Amino acid sequence: KYFNFHSKRKCIITQSTLNKKPNSDNFKNAQSKAALAALLFSSITPHAIALDDAAPIASPPQVMEVEAPNPNTSNPLPFSQNLVLNAPKTQASPVSDLPESTQWRYSEFLNAVKKGKVERVRFSKDGSALQLTAVDGRRANVIVPNDPDLIDILAMNGVDISVSEGEGGNGLFSVIGNLLFPFIAFAGLFFLFRRSQGGPGGPGGLGGPMDFGRSKSKFQEVPETGVTFADVAGADQAKLELQEVVDFLKNPDKYTALGAKIPKGCLLVGPPGTGKTLLARAVAGEAGVPFFSCAASEFVELFVGVGASRVRHLFENAKSKAPCIVFIDEIDAVGRQRGAGLGGGNDEREQTINQLLTEMDGFSGNSGVIVLAATNRPDVLDSALLRPGKFDRQVTVDRPDVAGRVRILQVHSRGKALAKDVDFDKIARRTPGFTGADLQNLMNEAAILAARRDLKEISKDEISDALERIIAGPEKKNAVVSDEKKKLVAYHEAGHALVGALMPEYDPVAKISIIPRGQAGGLTFFAPSEERLESGLYSRSYLENQMAVALGGRVAEEVIFGEDNVTTGASNDFMQVSRVARQMVERLGFSKKIGQVAIGGGGGNPFLGQQMSTQKDYSMATADVVDSEVRELVEKAYERAKQIITTHIDILHKLAQLLIEK
């Protein structure tokens, strides 16, 4: 009664039915069973019979109903009359080898295409992915690599190909999206520019293109620099000139009653560190009028024409506040001589200086604005700046003398605890040629040394050590010096000192040291004459003595250690001697053969519109004479130094031994 049907149409009669023993009931239905068996086996194909493996049961056994034969019905077929078989219709389900997921690998996609199981594909807009539709209706997505043969494979297998138009689908939105970013960027830049100019965007300082033309000068309606003329020492003549300018601003009637006119400009000239800017700050603190200050380097910037624009803007503001003072520091940055002609291009500084000249004394005039300027390079300034009507006064701020250095030391010692042994006069005499900035640095270094040594006061020792540190560099206390090297350096420095001390009309010896400082293994300090230093006048005998003193170190090495054991320690001495001897022959007229003739003059700076190169204004024969004269001066100085050392060799030994011991 029970039958299992496999998908391959194999039929198996259940063992429980066949194993039943025959009885009367079974025998009665023998004909029906025989007919049923004949029908079933007739439907089995030879292929199905050949498959003798047991098939898994796919579903529960189906109940088959067999009706009893009807005697009233005739059927020509044996065993089949009145037999009705009501069985469910079965069909084998096809097995699919397509992937079950919705995301296929590219290899799976190609296999399906080649087997004809892909009906159509739809590529994305950028071609990086596609969506397929299989023949059974399912859909899947595939990531497409860069395969140039893919389109040909799809076409050969009859696959319908299409391309997506994108997600937007509307060209208007695409155009708007492309224009939106540039518009936002332009609006942002416009907002920043407006903000930098104090427009509706609000005040700000981010800087805009129109802000380049504005002057960056610092303005003080009531200057509070904290500096007055009482704080300026060592520049009495310069201070007097500027005090007159301040008095002109405070009491103009005193001068105009006599027909005097206010100076248009005042140029402060002097070496670096002499107090030019300090004097300008003192003028601002004393004048009591509006004060504009700027650096000349601030005029020239990125864009062409900015320098002239800033000069105009500066003087517009100054004229609105007249009477006032405009201070331009380091004016040589824009006031260099015009017309050099090198490079073939436009120099922005020329436009700036032209505008400055016009504003100071142009067609429109300039009333009530005094221009102060400072420079340490007056030789590079344009001649138009230096003429009357521009900078009417040139105030030279030179290095202070002894009395000026004493007053400067007193100013910079305010607020510092000094010991009783500090003598400003002695310090001033040991610092010839020092500027105000140098003396300020000296006192500051002395205070640092005192603090490093845990002292409560600054003594003369700290000031002396600070002076040597500034001149020669810091001590190399940890330097390992052998006894042989120490002895050599001691005799070398003793030779300098001995020749200098016994040479007539030369500077006195101030200090000898064999402690390494900076690049020097030892130093001999001489105290130059204040009168000679200030006047700048040096006699022939002084220059010859200077060369002999410089050669004293090499002579001492040669006498004590022999010619084969001399060292390179005298290399700088030789350079100094050669320079002095050549100047004596070529420029100073101290040669009998050359006479009072200056030869070998420099050609000037081509960047200042001067000569492009050095011109040789003497013959080769004259050059040979110059060389022989220089060599003769050096040899004469060497013999003088050697004579002094050999004559006083005992003093040399004692001095060297004293240096080694201390």
Swiss-Prot record:
GO terms for biological process: cell division; proteolysis. Pfam families: AAA, AAA_lid_3, Peptidase_M41. It is found in: Plastid, Chloroplast membrane. It is a multi-pass membrane protein. InterPro entries: AAA+_ATPase (IPR003593), AAA_lid_3 (IPR041569), ATPase_AAA_core (IPR003959), ATPase_AAA_CS (IPR003960), FtsH (IPR005936), P-loop_NTPase (IPR027417), Peptidase_M41 (IPR000642), Peptidase_M41-like (IPR037219). Binds 1 zinc ion per subunit. Disulfide bonds: none annotated. The keyword Ribonucleoprotein does not apply. ATP binds at residues 270-277. GO terms for molecular function: ATP binding; ATP hydrolysis activity; ATP-dependent peptidase activity; metal ion binding; metalloendopeptidase activity. SUPFAM superfamilies: FtsH protease domain-like, P-loop containing nucleoside triphosphate hydrolases. The chain crosses the membrane at residues 35-55, 173-193. In the N-terminal section; belongs to the AAA ATPase family. HAMAP family: FtsH. This is ATP-dependent zinc metalloprotease FTSH, chloroplastic. The lineage of its organism: Eukaryota, Viridiplantae, Streptophyta, Embryophyta, Tracheophyta.
